[in-house]
């Protein structure tokens, strides 16, 4: 997939600092990155590649040897063995050696820094920090001979890992105060400010270095720091004038010597909309710094267009297209300038590589029809010339340009649908066998009417070349099916036609399997996409008929594909979502792990599995998933400054801006914020049966205050949606939507995969904010109980400490506001549902959130019997309705109900049980042998005591009903379930329904010869077993049920214990 590959490439660019190799690099590499040796700058790019490959660090010995003599006067021969021991991870030996070194040099800050580094590597963080502070104290003494860059850089490494970068910064600042003319120390201080993202102090330090050394690079460091202030801190744009003045003064006295410096200057002028000034710079002597003519022309064209000199920009872009006819972005710029349409710049300014839009706005209102015709005719002439020049090549750009022109005509109102269809057909005849055809024409299909879309599919079928080579016929057939999916035409076909089409594709796949017999397993096979298309058809057939056999058949088809070639990510993602739907979540998680998601892909791809895991009882796997994701994100956010500083050092200033903005984008990721909250809530869910453990967790969470602060922060910021939704199946375009859960009548066409960021952002923000309030509300609810019980006995008041109750009420108001209503309306809603006046459907997809509200609303006024009754009725109604809805259904057809029950029992019911535990603890005598006092006697007869007992009894009974359903499912013999799974695929003779594709595949496998398909494919075909696949699916479903049953039994036992304790009250 094109964009998947894009992110794999970007991983290497953006995440050197957090890659697996980087984490294990010896510290010498890190120290070398911090030092000021010129040899480091000379071959910076080579060093980055070396870092990425994890190259051994012995080659650094020569550079390091020159530094060792400066480390407080310690000879290199005494230090080298310590570094060798650290490099080989022999930390005990290294500690022994450094202890010996300190005996000889007790006042050496460098020796102490080495000791701190060793302690940190051994996981002794407290000892490491203590030693760092000792070294810092020595550095602050008057003996200037003890202060050198190697000591400071070693301390910086340790302190950064200990999250005390401020101490390292203070050490460097002190050193720079002592050595105001030491460039190396000032560079170290600049690096500290880079790590702190302190752009103002970066600027100030860079200016000092520039004044000291007069080097161009330090001035550009300052300019980049100013640009970052404007971009990230939203500082006044007057700073840009300051930066421009500094550059002009430098150019007047020293000129410029690097292309990157020129690019910074031009970007600075562009930020201020000084396009004519930028053009003047580019056309002057400095323009000669850009050696590649096309690059220079692109900049010139952009500046001319933004200066509204469209005619000159058109001439420039024509030159570029003559030099590079396949430059698609350039053609769009050319056409935009020709039509004086500035919307193209808005598109490219805001282009999102994760969510690229297929539609580009076009403006025509300012053009008369005559003007439009004249200019579009000029564009057509250019395109025809480019096509003639590229006639014997495989360039798609000139032919795609013809489609763009026809689309512009159509949007202008020329009513040229037939001409556009003809151009699409011609493009098919030339490139229809390529896998990219469907994605190339998607934007042009969207402007056609439904009838024309259906007619276009028929045109493709009629004009496909059956006499061409087998690979070309296969490619064209695949393209036609993909276009049929894009147009939604397939959703209007009768069921039997879809079945027939799927069978035809299965036969085509089998017939062409021999074309791939000599391919390497890593290479894509011919017709590989056919199995994905077949599975999409089968899923649609299931949606229409609710016949589980179609889903089972889709599973079999995709598993066969993975058996033949296990590297196809499309098969894994489709299986992941099908397994998730039928409740075989362990297999779904297995398929996700098989994607081998690493680095930035954890941010863009984990949406495929995260939501399902959050709604499942598979807490161990969920915990690992969250830990891995948060570790990558936290490591990147902590260490991304390493790469930013490398960009500064290597004079790659555009990357400086890019890396900082990329870091900010990840930092504001909605998924990252959600995962941080979910990780904390998961801990509470896992330990909800132990009151003492919950208190410990809440204490670690600062009583939930930190997450409340996070909720407030999220409310005032714009979240970034980095998930790559283009990789999701059609039936679940985003994690919150699954068309299979509703009837087929609700949608009659395949929804276009469009950017859903705008419509999701507010909902996601509110969901994260609501979740962030849970730990604090749990804490406050627990704090309310002792006073509430006391006041219930003494005054029958509302109960609870006034301040605590007031805060809880405020949070409840915030919570309901995030649910879209007021507190009073929310109370009315849950009351009516508990009484049966409204159905649970009124709660929508936020059912669990509403139940959470009801739990804490009850905790806010524990002495109200009415509140207890409403809450009890809600639990009973919402849980038993689901149990009755599932009835005798098997897991495959009711897993969505199981997901809801899992959430109810592990969240609101768990929090309510926790509050009951707090009530029980407060109501019981503190000593085992202590007799009941008067307060206890009064409590036993108080209304609240009876309400607690009734609630415990109801919850026990309700959970037992859930457990009974789970036991009924688990008591079904595994072999019987496997047989039932396979029975859905069996059919009589030529009857329609599930099993037809499976029949084609099984017949082919039975008759296939090794000489025909090759040894590897032949062995894979013979190893494929439908019974094994069915058994794995059933076992995965049973594992989910067992995990859920274990949770239910744990809750029931807790409630039984609480029932016994309350009987003594």
UniProtKB/Swiss-Prot annotation:
<comment type="similarity">
    <text>Belongs to the MDM20/NAA25 family.</text>
</comment>
<feature type="repeat" description="TPR">
    <location>
        <begin position="294"/>
        <end position="327"/>
    </location>
</feature>
<dbReference type="GO" id="GO:0009506">
    <property type="term" value="C:plasmodesma"/>
</dbReference>
<protein>
    <recommendedName>
        <fullName>N-terminal acetyltransferase B complex auxiliary subunit NAA25</fullName>
    </recommendedName>
</protein>
<dbReference type="Pfam" id="PF09797">
    <property type="entry name" value="NatB_MDM20"/>
</dbReference>
<dbReference type="InterPro" id="IPR011990">
    <property type="entry name" value="TPR-like_helical_dom_sf"/>
</dbReference>
<dbReference type="Pfam" id="PF13432">
    <property type="entry name" value="TPR_16"/>
</dbReference>
<keyword id="KW-0963">Cytoplasm</keyword>
<keyword id="KW-0802">TPR repeat</keyword>
<dbReference type="GO" id="GO:0005737">
    <property type="term" value="C:cytoplasm"/>
</dbReference>
<comment type="function">
    <text>Auxiliary subunit of the NatB N-alpha-acetyltransferase complex. Required for flowering time regulation and for vegetative and reproductive plant development.</text>
</comment>
<dbReference type="InterPro" id="IPR019183">
    <property type="entry name" value="NAA25_NatB_aux_su"/>
</dbReference>
<dbReference type="InterPro" id="IPR019734">
    <property type="entry name" value="TPR_rpt"/>
</dbReference>
